[in-house]
Amino acid sequence: MPHEHKHDIFCAGRAGKLIGFLRRLTQNPYRILKPYLKEGMTLLDFGSGPGFFTVPAAKLVGTSGKIYAVDVQQQMLDMLVKYADKKGVLGNIITINNPEHEIGIELEADIILAIYVAHEVPDRDKLFLSLKKRLKPEGFLLLAEPKHRVTETEFKETLEIAKKNGLEEAGKFKMVESRTAVLKKS
């Protein structure tokens, strides 16, 4: 019997925790993203929050690349814009506020990030179908969920939903205190 799916949204008022020094130390975004991102690529950061992965991704893809940052909370995107501007990478980041947990734009991405967000989305079938539609045939979706919020059983259920919607597991990536999977189109 499936577990009840939690979908509480992380409060923007606590966003400092999402980009703080301790998280950068334990979940270094450059170390996580570098094996997947090259200059000129397009990345979709679904549930970008204040830009913990978005800003490093923008540096890795360079000025010839494009980053789409999608979040349900405009306050998170406002923080992301300030952070990206401070780091000098705002020029290749497009922010999209969509309170309906949708992407809201047609695009094709080399890499899609869904980091600490799937458990917040009420309709994960719709989520994975939408993400698959925007993933290039040779692209990868990096999925991570926090161990303190998502049990191993719940994460396996999430992977089954992804599989049902045309994505298969192609591996894992290392991220402290997280359950992870690298997904590709099946």
Give, region by region, the residue ranges found by the protein language model:
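A short glycine-rich, Lys/Arg-flanked "PGG" loop and its adjoining helix->strand segment in the class I
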Residues: 125-137
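Core SAM-dependent methyltransferase catalytic element
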Residues: 165, 174-186
